[in-house]
Amino acid sequence: VIPPQKAGFIADRAGVTDASGWVPVKPESFESTRGKNVYVLGDATIAAPMPKSGFAANTQGKLAAAAIAAELTGQPLPTASLANTCYSLVGTHYGISVAGVYRAQDGKLQEVAGGVSPLQADAGFRKAEAIYGAAWYQAISTDIWGG
């Protein structure tokens, strides 16, 4: 049994969740719409069409940090350009991927580019995706934990 999904206890306790149990955010900064100077990212947010993924949260965190720095220094907000990329290794030489690029437009996040691995891709394509997947994993790991 999977329990109902929602933002964590701390978000609810801080009063930034809405009736859905998630945190609505400003797509330009990931500042909560329900709490000034409260920035939320990742699975806790209402950030559709972005998926709830670690890579998406990583780019959201970078945007939030840049927005906080801009706020503290009196600078304009950075342009909200976010990405999600995910590779899955189905076999040793068989990879698949999904990617999306998102921008804040008209008060909402909009997917402006992206795609998935072609369903009928040949073995060479799948092998390349497996190689890209290994490089992607190394890059995101280094970005998060350092090299």
Question: How does the language model describe each region?
Answer:
Residues S20, S29-S32, S53, S81, ...:
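Generic serine detector
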